[in-house]
Amino acid sequence: MTAETRILELRAELDQHNYRYYVLDEPSVPDAEYDRLFNELKALEAEHPHLVTPDSPTQRVGGAALAAFSQVRHEVPMLSLGNAFEEADLREFGRRVVEGLDQPGAVDYSCEPKLDGLAVSLLYRDGQLVQGATRGDGTTGEDISANVRTVRNIPLKLQGKGWPAVLEVRGEVYMSKAGFDRLNAAQAEAGGKTFANPRNAAAGSLRQLDSKITASRPLEFCCYGVGQLSESIGDSHIGILEQLKAWGLPISRELKHAAGIEECLAYYRDIGERRNSLPYEIDGVVFKVNSLAAQRELGFRAREPRWAIAHKFPAMEELTEVLDVEFQVGRTGAVTPVARLKPVKVAGVTVSNATLHNMDEIARLGLRIGDTVIIRRAGDVIPQVMQVVLERRPQDARPVEVPSECPVCGSQVERTQLVKRSKGKETTSEGAVYRCVGRLACGAQLKQAIIHYVSRRAMDIDGLGEKSVEQLVDEGLIGSPADLYKLQFEQVVGLEGFAEVSTQKLLDAIEASKRPSLARFIYALGIPDVGEETAKVLARSLGSLARVQQALPQVLTYLPDIGLEVAYEIHNFFEDEHNQKVIQQLLDSGMQLQDEGELAAEFAASTTLAGMIAKLDIASVGPTGAEKLVAKLDSLDKIIAADGIDLRQALAAKQADAVREFFKDEANQKLARDIEAQLLAFGMHWSSEKKVAEGLPLAGQTWVLTGTLERMSRDIAKDKLESLGAKVAGSVSGKTHCVVAGPGAGSKLAKAAELGVKVLDEDAFVTFLAEQGIAV
């Protein structure tokens, strides 16, 4: 292929990508792929300058404006920046700057994160916002004035005084990670389009023809410079940004000075380490020579300034090929598809696998084996397939099919059924998840179940990592969690990683695990959708394993943060004969649950007959209607037996008819009586004079743990505080009741002193626990 042919190909491909990105709001390749194509074209044109044409993508920035918006000409072009991908690139930039300025000493730079959003221009005349425009092709953009006026942190009128008659502010409109998550959740619930990432969401939201849609989106603005000015407003980049801030315009909180390129590199590394904890997406750091005089001296080249550069982070998105789709089996039997990829480097790490979640996700993506896809990796998150590049689909691409048999144990694979319950009715539909029915007879499920059971936040059996568990299962030594308590010294010693001392330590740890808290034991069972916090709610509210096992789904919904779907997962788990057998085996092994007791006083005190009626989900009867009904008819028997006249004395006609219709159904009568019987058996009393109960001693209080505790772990301390009703927070505020400070306590202790919050050292904390009847 000749250079001219390749140049024409690259221009055509880049033009198509620009059109998809800027006009259709449908990016077709990751930024890293675009950069590679652009740099290849740039290099070829440098080798063959006679082939450079005015319409080449290297001679302009971006793509054409949408015809639906009126066009705006930028008096000062909105140029893009050159890129540095390696430290060597940044050092070379610094060398060129020093050489161009020919000045002694370190050059002063401004440093700020490169937000991943949409570049915009805001024009203020006499302090009033009169125009907003996109970058467009750098010379001509789109008039989005109505839309930028809806972005809440863009001032419609500047604050203070002294601003020039004409002030053009430039910056980035973006969407925070939290805002993006909220938007996608709302879009999914409404059956609308969801977005691949915050950048696409911001661009798509800002370029809506209907500004009401833009106003509903969680957009934010951050300024990074100025364009046309009727008069100077500063002699340095940072000085200008600080002045803009004084006039009410938001600037980056991460804006800093750097003396020389080495300090720039230190800033880049620091931001890189904190990148995933920032509330917004960034794709690099921008460095600018701070002095405006120095900027003027350095000047510009074709499409970028010589005094600024964007130091990009390793790409979070890349293109690669799906070589195959395999299926893995998890702890609950879920058969999950995993994409096997042609290895590619993403965010500095070589990626060869990516999660596909379930078959609904594969259908949503339209994925086939052999497709070229965009994958994304952010921080420690498992790489995900974001999009299929349909233009690159080969003719022999194959559909993904779910195996009919478990790839591990050969048991049947079944599709889950989703049961929706509303207004007393049930509807069933197919779920997105497929499950192996093999339970603990399936090696994959057994291993994952044991790994979860022994984990630190579950039974906390030290010395049993994933490899050790896999070895014990593969050797046939354990076939269920209860088999851990049957292990003998002679069976373990000599296995890989187990000498005599380590074997004895393991057996001691297993023996010590026989005295767990109820919450830890529930969590260790691996009930679907029951995490650590839900396990604590179950233990704290119901007080005993027997009550948790017996609880009806409707009763479980009375507990904090447990909805009906999760309640059915819990109920179905304990109804299952296989699970009952496993639990009984564990109890028979000598398990002694430490904190079993009575029903939580606040739970018993807060559960009323009216509350029970409201939870029955009778059409049009909410909490207020239920209260009125119980005020007139003070028992369930009376409510069930009531005729239309009695009911209409308590409720509006529509509600009364709904109650009567509901209880005509004998199944509903039985359900209501079963719920009441269980609540009464658990210790509830409908008579208010019998319902006086004392709350937990720390109910309503917020405590904070800081430093290293020597007599117990922080997790154990947290469990003990929560058992007394306290909320354990991660930071100190004016609402904090007490701080427990061990050795090494730092900023939290200082904050407590500043706010006058009570502080206990570990000895005082242990004494306090003893006073509450809690041993350490």
Swiss-Prot record:
The keyword Transcription regulation does not apply. InterPro entries: BRCT_dom, BRCT_dom_sf, DisA/LigA_HHH, DNA_ligase, DNA_ligase_AS, DNA_ligase_CS, DNAligase_adenylation, DNAligase_N. Signal peptide: none annotated. GO terms for biological process: DNA repair; DNA replication. NAD(+) binds at D31, A32, E33, Y34, D35, S80, L81, E112, R135, E172, K288, K312. GO terms for cellular component: cytosol. The active site is at K114 (n6-amp-lysine intermediate). Zn(2+) binds at C406, C409, C436, C442. DNA ligase that catalyzes the formation of phosphodiester linkages between 5'-phosphoryl and 3'-hydroxyl groups in double-stranded DNA using NAD as a coenzyme and as the energy source for the reaction. It is essential for DNA replication and repair of damaged DNA. Belongs to the NAD-dependent DNA ligase family. LigA subfamily. HAMAP family: DNA_ligase_A. This is DNA ligase.
